[in-house]
Amino acid sequence: SWIVLDNNKANLARGTRVIWEKIDRADFKLNKINTNSILKNIDMHLGLVFHRFLEGINLKREKLKIFINGSEVEPKNPFNEESNATIKSAISTLKYNNSDIFVQYFILPHEDMVSIEEWKNFEGEGGYIKNQGCYVYRCNRLIVSSTWFGIMPKLASTKLCRAKIDIGNDIDSDWKIDIKKSTASPPKSIKNFLTELIINNIERKGRGVVNKRTQELIQDKDLKLWV
């Protein structure tokens, strides 16, 4: 049965309240620390999956606001696009069955090029090595994150590499998108393009940023030994 509750956000002219009860495998009764950890993970997940809606960028609508227990969810853009130290490629437009697919890659700044806070903000749950890879957006909602689609393994030397892929809702079957909109696999022609892009551009530039900084540190250390 449905239960209608008064919205305690009296200043909101309109909105939607989502009430989750009896969540499978989530035991909020254990202790406060466990509950806070679960809520933090939910906040991070929603902030990442819906970050474009929360940012309100390039959308033909006002930006979305999500509250968890009264606290507003902040967008978790994984690409650090505002940093001058981030390497950003041009946007590639691919035609597939009369549908446009947009691809852009980013090499995030080395740890020594940003503040500790900024480094942590874009690390993501599990760290940089885990969160490298492609991020697929379907109509601006993130449906797949941090995967190279089997094209290459996740290595420390490419931990700063991320790519965003935008697709519409008219090629779901081609991308093998499931009913939950939580998995996707690129068609062969698109994967061939991604393979060439990842191997010849993304991997090479990502390794270059990491290796260059490592070499600089080695040289600095050698110089100091001679002082």
PLM ranges: what are they?
Residues 44-48, 69-73, 134-139, 172:
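A short, hydrophobic secondary-structure junction motif
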